[in-house]
Amino acid sequence: MSADDVVYDLVGLGFGPANIAIGAALTEKWQQDPTFSIKNTLFIEKHEVFRWHPGMLLPDAKMQISFLKDLATLRTPNSPYTFLSYLHSEDRLLSFINRGSTVPSRKEYSDYLAWAAQKVQDNGVKVKFGHEIIALDDGPDGTIEVRYRNVRTQEETLIRARDLIIAPGGTPCIPDFLQPFVNHPRVSHSSSYALKIGDMFDSLNHLSRPLRVAIIGSGQSAAEVTIDVRNRLASIPSTGRHEVDMLIRKGSLKPSDDSPFANEIFDPASTDAWFSTGSKHLRDAILAEYKQTNYSVVNPRTLEALYEIIYGQRLNAAVSRRTNVEEPSDPVINIKPYTSVLSIQTVGSQGERVRGELLLSPEGASASKDEGFVMVTKHMMTGAESQTNYDVILYATGYQRTAWVELFKNTGIAKHFGITPSTSKVVLRPSADLVGGRQHQEFFHDSSPSTASSSTVSTPPTSPETSRFSSPISSRIVSQDLYLSRSYQLLPKDGENTLRPRVYLQGVEEATHGLSDTLLSVLGVRAGEVVADLASRYHSSA
């Protein structure tokens, strides 16, 4: 392991949109205030290059927000990091205006983020791509020792930081029934869809028979993937019609509420109101009220496109019945409402079935390349069970944002926040709740596998689900409250005065800062607030 003698003023975990916005706010601060003390910064990113949802960069996919909710406009409209600055630098400003829409394509917004990522580096922000942080410990002289490693070579490096920002992003939420199949070459979360679907279908070309694809989920990603899969299947020769089954637990797909009044829940002012609400019960009620702005819903334009396809199928079937003319061979989309997945098994070319547990090994995953799947589902209203064979399973079940806890609780600095390796659940609370005193909970939790009827989710849970292979006995879960300031700083436990560095969280604080926290809506404003809080420390100590 090598050691870097440089002490960084700020080290960031991750270099996605949240920390790019931080980098942009920092470089603007450097321009405005040459005496600003936070100058030497480093962000550590696991990917080899900047990537933003590459698995969902689908043809014609649109963003769900105005371009004005970019990395900087709501904070500093004349910032060099705005979407308009990007368009101007790319000589597309007039062309974009002529489009007559404030909503860019997902491809263009991804390119904007990549442009901004490079621009902050050009302006002095250091980034280590292809590396990941593996340890955080107390360092000398009021610093944090940060140990990271090269993902490819596994070489480790030790550095020191005066302050730390953790912006880990989300990780795919995997339903229990799919856990054994995560390494299967023809099973994928929507986050990897565009990167994998080509190889999946290429591996099935030799079959020359109708293919059947299952898509699990009822949100925007599930709907987009369903349409894209149908379009791709149309170019694959077959002796019959390919089928795409969209499995949803609801009775129907629901539209997202993007009306002007509902959209105000994503305004920066709503962050203040949410944070100052001194009751978890009330915050949960607000979340439930506005759930249809973001969770398990589909943009009305996408719904219309999907329904038009299904209506066309019904029209073709009716014309065929009346005229006795064969229907077009276009792939068929079937939406299956009130559907719960009970079990999945793989089936070999000879019809033999293989338990999912065997696929957890590399050998099992390799041996499964020519297998299909048998899925048993249950209609949640009638209780009727059915069995269907599939060639590909895609799941758009959202993301969970608690993976950072596993790293953090095993670090040397976790003790300053009352977190230990035995902590199995962290509950984020706003510092406004401290009026009632800190809370610490230990309770018994039944960790037996969940029942089949509740094993699949269309909306990601707020924490990872219990593994279906866990022991069916009660286990003690230690739940620890972790408090955040309005400026996103993790607050040390009561009586803790030995930790001088500040630790900030980004993009995982929906429970404390509201619905917009995991989205792009407030990135620019939030970055400005964090940088201002960092600056206040140095001003107050001057």
UniProtKB/Swiss-Prot annotation:
Binds 1 FAD per subunit. One of its GO terms (biological process) is biosynthetic process. Keywords: FAD, Flavoprotein, Monooxygenase, NADP, Oxidoreductase. Its EC number is 1.14.13.196. It catalyses: L-ornithine + NADPH + O2 = N(5)-hydroxy-L-ornithine + NADP(+) + H2O; L-ornithine + NADH + O2 = N(5)-hydroxy-L-ornithine + NAD(+) + H2O. Substrate binds at K69, N263, E264, I265, F266, N294, S521. PANTHER family: L-ORNITHINE N(5)-MONOOXYGENASE, MONOOXYGENASE. This is L-ornithine N(5)-monooxygenase.
